[in-house]
């Protein structure tokens, strides 16, 4: 695991000197404290910081192939590198190390850009191909490893694992995208390919990009190609028992291949279904007790430590845990530094702390991320199915009936009923997006006044429309994998673990497992009110019954309580500051109304208030010359 960065001349002009690349790499030392390496030509420069997990002594980067004409830096892990190495050795390639990175370099020399589809793992890759005079960038299928890029000055494109690598380039004057700010409040994150800065993007998952500089001021040749796609059809036709056996085998293999490591490792254990299954499968392949790490809260409705302890005891793990209290919100500045752009998921706090806990004992962990998207585990999938049943049963009259009921009922019940009516009146996929949005159009008007987006879902709507999938239910799974999973869950895990120089591997997002699970009939994912139907059948072979019936909690923190008590002074100081008011981003009367509604218990505004604090804290970290674009 590493962090990478680099520059390329787009039109043949000279690049900044080596000190610029060194400065870019220094910003991501936390991603790779063990080693640094760089390579320069007159038209391209690449660098890396390394966290040594495989071939600790011999895995220095950049790695080379084709007599040094190919130079590669890489962030991630490749789990099939040994099989790939055997194939390449049979074709005459001689290896100088036992690292997975050298396999990628030789695979590129042999297969070109076709090599990326051969890699089983997580990665962001940069290759300087001197024979073709091109830079090639690539990102893994699901987007576990990040890669930002953009033109930082005329004729110079920069890229890196984190936005802070680009901020280290002298002369770049970032400009805030106010469209992205509103997306942040609608969704809780900024969806790819956009970022908080205008002109800076993210290479989409499952894509590679080739950049060939132009000559003498000419235009560059830039090609972006998708090399991976998740197919939901045709569906498997095996009987349920056979599919259960196949799922067990895929899960077990996904865990097994991720246990290759030359350093100590463990696992996150929340006590929920996904992480418990991962830990149970890990113990099948280990001869020593597994190290597990859990986080909890004093507030009973949010605390999963008793559940995690029961699973740890059942599996015989060496268990470590800690409790998160309101003073953990003091981590906000640290989190903002590591996320680089506004990130609204408050579960970043416990994820950061459990990563910090784990990093005291191990250098790598397995996590349970991805199970909800793959097997329809979130409650919102059940809620959406319920909305569709209401719509069918009322022959389309439900929106009007719900709005009428909302007008007649007082307080929170009326607001909820009105909200249901509004969603029932929306077309696909806005009816689903409105269900999961953190801020609805009325909230956006409170936050931004007349400048609020007229179309809050425009940046993600098309991700939920796939003509090759014949049901809205599975278009939702596909869309969530392409948006929420990539830009919220995986961003959260990457930044919080890497901030602590800890590698996280997600076996439930193994490409083979995804390919298998996508083609399962949907009623083996969500059956009635039970999500993860077939996954639970497998889990029943590994875990106590109480884990299977436990209500899903997620990793949420008790923001509503905290903002009414311990965090209230911090909130009031933030929104009352002169800098906050002078920025002119928010409608001040609307912000005050949000605070009043929350403090008086009229509505839970905890998530929106948290995002207000995140954005303001992030704004205070920016260079003085940074300016926001006008809102449209």
Could you describe each region identified by the protein language model?
Residues 166, 294-295, 341, 385-393:
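Short beta-alpha connecting loops at secondary-structure transitions
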Residues 317, 341, 363, 485:
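Short glycine/serine/threonine/alanine-rich loop segments
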Residues 336-338, 379-386, 628-630:
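Short secondary-structure boundary/capping segments
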Residues 299, 323, 342-345, 392, ...:
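Alpha-helix capping and helix-loop boundary segments enriched in small/acidic/polar residues
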Residues 353-412, 484, 493-513:
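Active-site adenylate/phosphate-handling loop in enzymes that bind or generate adenylated species
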